[in-house]
Amino acid sequence: MGLLSAVFGTYSEREVKRIRPIVSKINELDEVMQKLSDDELKAKTVEFKERLNNGETVDDILPEAFAVVREASKRVLNMKHYDEQLIGGVVLHQGRIAEMKTGEGKTLVATLPAYLNGLTGKGVHIITVNDYLAKRDAEQMGELYGFLGLTTGVIVHELTNEQRREAYNSDITYGTNNEFGFDYLRDNMVIYKEERVQRKLNFTIVDEVDSILIDEARTPLIISGQGEKSTEFYKVADYFVKTLVKEKDYTIDEKANAVMLTDEGFHKAEQTFKVENYADAENVELQHYVTQALKANYAMRRDKDYMVKDGEVIIVDEFTGRLMEGRRYSDGLHQAIEAKENVKIARESKTLATITFQNYFRMYEKLSGMTGTALTEENEFREIYGLDVIVVPTHKPVVRIDNPDLVFKSEKGKIMAVVDEIAKAHEVGQPVLVGTVSIEKSELISSMLKKKGVPHQVLNAKFHEQEAEIITHAGEKGMVTIATNMAGRGTDIKLGEGVLEIGGLKIIGTERHESRRIDNQLRGRSGRQGDSGESTFFISLEDDLMRIFGSEKIQGVVEKLGLEEDEAIESKLVSKSIENAQKKVEGNNFDIRKTLLGYDDVMNKQREVIYKQRSEVLEGEDVKEEILHMLRDVISDAVNTHIKEDAEDYRESFLYLISYLNDICIPTNEVNLPALADMSKEEIVDHLYDVAVKSYENKEAEFTPERLREIERVVLLRSVDTKWMDHINNMDNLKQGIGLRAFKQVDPVQAYQMEGSAMFEEMIDSIKNETVKMLFHVKVERAPERVRVAQETNAVHGDKPSAPVGPVRNLNKFGRNDVCPCGSGKKFKNCCGREA
């Protein structure tokens, strides 16, 4: 492979070569564009739109459109796209990932494909990692789009529905992945089509695409309502696990981040909870509480995985070190941690709508992304999203020096060496950016620097604006900045006066991350646009990566050398071993994400069916025909269930059948039982269907056709929503228990697909039964109105299997003693609450 690349160039190099002729065409138009007046340049937008309406494609007008944006950018922003940025723009327009190093101007690159695709009027979404960057980019680049006659919107958390709709109707819309995902889910929970805010998902450019499509891929978005389960069980389980002894009662698998009871632990659980067999299926709920309590107490670490602040447990993002205010771990883990820390335990929530980023972004007509580091995950981008990664050449060569890793025997020796290295650089005024893996490590280094009298800034980012401000100054003379690995992404570090001469920005990594990509991101903060700089990673054998995944060979080498605590070695063997450990973890994480996608694809297909049905109802389509199809299915199922060919007493079977259908759709005393005895099953179905349709026609006369059409939509919508929400939770429970099938040599994903499909069919049957029954029993004086079956209370960015939850939004249900929202005047429990 190496020889072929050397002869023919890498895949990226070959693709870039293909794009260069397009860049030449854009450059040829440069002089023409410069001669145009502002008004003539602006008029190009109208001209392009007309050409598109007359049959030209966006590819046809690409060179000219890019040339227009380039010239407008020079006039409005005083920034002119250089050739490498034009290449990046073409890559994004083609629906690929552009890997562009830090400082190469990705924000400006996005304006090229955004303008070109914005001309179609179908909308372009530009995804950023936080609200601050969304607002900043929309404001800055909005001037350019506005000059050219395109509108710009920005979606941030605090907007009203009206403001969101306006932003989505803009030609180009900026916002975070969470906001776009939640709006999609909410749009599929509305009860009137006018409440929707999003348009069809057309073209998106995802900034920091690796962070969103890979790091957060396992984290579902969840909109939830309040659950009913008591929180007392968490306290009881917490008390129990705190009595257990490590190795004797439980073991910890650090690689899998799991805690398991031993046989002795099982025995203790049986004694404590007075159950005969703890592992029995009937004790699944007890197992759930104990499992989460074990994990909370022995796998989750305070100040690393979460912090306790003002009596509240707050998740710490494992990639950025940021506090994730408002997010909660799902599946009861957050409650278990609250019990462990003895703070108020919030109730578990009930999921009302959910989707993963993997499936949300795959719905776009065209998906593209940009980042400084994507090549190490090229296979995953291609396999999961069908995206190529193209490495765009840098405008100036990278001259940063990446030093070999320094390996220390102990954590203490390593930290002392890091502090000494920072102090040395500070003496000569060289700015230093120190990357840590946790808030805890940041604070340890900070306290040691204080003792040495070295002034510094600590970035445990809570406010993105403040974070961006600190990062902006990190390249100035004498600055020392300590930050968790990815804090401040999206903000450039520009070098201050005189810094180039003393070596540029010095990067110190205090630990290797389990992903090479995160390490590369830290290195990439230095040496932007051909600046000088250097990077070094300080590693100890006590680091998590080395301890859990490092080979015994390295331990042996270090012990043979008899290193002192503060002595370090540079070794190719060690560096290679670290890289192998990282590859192993990356491969493992990819497999997990692929497996989860296998699970989520089942739900995704089901979600598409349900959301399509909802959409048809909301669009005001006449659903009478569908209701009649449901009616026939309900009758047919009832006949097949009650009438068996080999039954001895037909009369008894018919009595049960008619009694059953009387409750649903057949009026009492309307069927001649003896006449049924001479009919085949098909004839019985036809006869009963005719009786039911006649009854329904009477109902229509009673209500008027127009009123009954609206009632049909209301009832179908309510039935679909109620059953779908229950189904989501049932599928979630199925997924929790399905892993045990692996012990029986059954593929869990396959089992989940088969059983999930059967459950979905049952849900569809249940929707049909409930809808038909409600429509045949509806009364003029209490005809149902459109109401939400639940109210949103929380939106969380869900939970990876054993990883932080993302955003959840909770929905309040109607209290059982509240007045029913249907307008009957009865209490909810005596009215629609009975049907629910």
Curated annotation (Swiss-Prot):
Q: Where in the cell is it found?
A: Cell membrane; Cytoplasm
* Catalytic activity line of the entry: ATP + H2O + cellular proteinSide 1 = ADP + phosphate + cellular proteinSide 2
| Top-level taxon in the UniProt lineage | Bacteria
Per the UniProt entry, the disulfide pairs are: none
Tell me which Pfam families the record gives. P-loop_SecA, SEC-C, SecA_DEAD, SecA_PP_bind, SecA_SW
What cofactor does this one take?
A: Zn(2+)
**Which residues are involved in binding Zn(2+)?**
820, 822, 831-832
Q: Which residues bind ATP?
A: 85, 103-107, 492
Swiss-Prot/TrEMBL keywords = ATP-binding, Cell membrane, Cytoplasm, Membrane, Metal-binding, Nucleotide-binding, Protein transport, Translocase, Translocation, Transport, Zinc
Coiled coil regions in record: none
Query: Whom does it interact with, and what assembly results?
Result: Monomer and homodimer. Part of the essential Sec protein translocation apparatus which comprises SecA, SecYEG and auxiliary proteins SecDF. Other proteins may also be involved.
Q: Give the function comment from the record.
A: Part of the Sec protein translocase complex. Interacts with the SecYEG preprotein conducting channel. Has a central role in coupling the hydrolysis of ATP to the transfer of proteins into and across the cell membrane, serving as an ATP-driven molecular motor driving the stepwise translocation of polypeptide chains across the membrane.
Any idea what this protein is called? Protein translocase subunit SecA
Q: Which organism is it from?
A: Clostridium botulinum (strain Alaska E43 / Type E3)
**What are the top taxonomic ranks of the organism?**
Bacteria, Bacillati, Bacillota, Clostridia, Eubacteriales
Gene assigned in the entry: secA
